[in-house]
Amino acid sequence: MAENPGLENHRIKSFKNKGRDVETMRRHRNEVTVELRKNKRDEHLLKKRNVPQEESLEDSDVDADFKAQNVTLEAILQNATSDNPVVQLSAVQAARKLLSSDRNPPIDDLIKSGILPILVKCLERDDNPSLQFEAAWALTNIASGTSAQTQAVVQSNAVPLFLRLLHSPHQNVCEQAVWALGNIIGDGPQCRDYVISLGVVKPLLSFINPSIPITFLRNVTWVIVNLCRNKDPPPPMETVQEILPALCVLIYHTDINILVDTVWALSYLTDGGNEQIQMVIDSGVVPFLVPLLSHQEVKVQTAALRAVGNIVTGTDEQTQVVLNCDVLSHFPNLLSHPKEKINKEAVWFLSNITAGNQQQVQAVIDAGLIPMIIHQLAKGDFGTQKEAAWAISNLTISGRKDQVEYLVQQNVIPPFCNLLSVKDSQVVQVVLDGLKNILIMAGDEASTIAEIIEECGGLEKIEVLQQHENEDIYKLAFEIIDQYFSGDDIDEDPSLIPEATQGGTYNFDPTANLQTKEFNF
């Protein structure tokens, strides 16, 4: 998991305050937001896309001479300014093919050759749509490169001409202009806002109609995703307001690529703070978003989980909107999903519900999800265990005594204590805080809790943590031992000793505590 030390420190400090506000308990993904996305290689998730080489009717015999010889950049450059339209088109096609045919197209060589102004000039040629198309394609591929290469296209004043081409009567020219603008917008918030300021949104959204070919609509949706990306700064509020109605239409689409992109767009918007979350809620899309958590396509589930997960980082009221859509009924399947990253995101979602009010905590309990969270705490990969630790600790702060008592009855303490020996000091502190909260809430039953902690090896781990280099951790460890373990030795209850297995792990009997202990916090 990507770390943000400043934020984590702030979060940890807040964590120690029993009455801390929900804003500090709820956790945004920060750098982690890209983790699932980066592991995907699906084209629809890329910020920029190169248009691949395709032999088509566009590639007529006019470029036969160029195919027959190894054309130099100098020749391309010279012929691209020819007065002979056939020669000029062949040269621009040759440039486009250089940019389309190779895994590492010679973008910098072409930029250095001085061809950019020539290609941009070709965009003006309304009398020759084939030339406009080829030039737009070449510029699209240049803009698909590095940020510096994209900036070279922007600085050549291509953007106003691409916007003009959105009104071309030739659909292939329109579509190529859309693709080029998508690459430029995908470069970052500065380019995004520049293209928005020139008026891209209205003509772009006008393409969303029943007659548009599916490939064109996929491109339009991908550009909408890029308009919604980036939150430093987020897109202008007016732009979000313009885009949301389109997303509310596209979320019904049966094409998987369009659906996935639509949901990712919503996830980016909900990652932009509570005001943008509210705009998404007000659009009415949430009831249509939640059922996608059980979509048969993992790509759709992943995007939907991120989008609803971002919404529940908002206020209790915003969280309740999602809960009111029966969202928790989807979580047994998500928590037992074969993909670990889905498990992790699902537990992250639930950690933000257990950071809510007591009714929201109860909803998680009533949905039967606590045992599944505890299973992930014990058996999940480390990233998932970390999220589960937050979910449990948040519950010890937000929950009522009976809710925390239920947590203990589900045998949360042994797997919780196991995390005290990990190297991640953030996790260690979250667990210590959770244990301390449980002990405090147990009141007269604290000795029973202390006994469970000792029997599962937790006390030994806490004793070691008194030597921890982190001041907050060693102080907390000392406080717990001083307040709850400094008296007479607790009589050992043999029924609580875990059975050792091969490999040095332990099998904890989940019924042992219930048989031998009565919890009345």
Swiss-Prot record:
Residues 1-29 are annotated as: Disordered. Coiled coil: none annotated. Residues 18-29 have a biased composition (Basic and acidic residues). Its main location: cytoplasm. It comes from Mus musculus. The modification Phosphotyrosine is found at residue 484. The modification Phosphoserine is found at residues 56, 60. Belongs to the importin alpha family. It comes from the Eukaryota. The modification N-acetylalanine is found at residue 2. The keyword Protein transport applies. It is found in: Cytoplasm; Nucleus. This is Importin subunit alpha-4. GO terms for cellular component: cytosol; NLS-dependent protein nuclear import complex; nucleoplasm. Keywords: Acetylation, Cytoplasm, Nucleus, Phosphoprotein, Protein transport, Repeat, Transport. The gene is Kpna3. Functions in nuclear protein import as an adapter protein for nuclear receptor KPNB1. Binds specifically and directly to substrates containing either a simple or bipartite NLS motif. Docking of the importin/substrate complex to the nuclear pore complex (NPC) is mediated by KPNB1 through binding to nucleoporin FxFG repeats and the complex is subsequently translocated through the pore by an energy requiring, Ran-dependent mechanism.
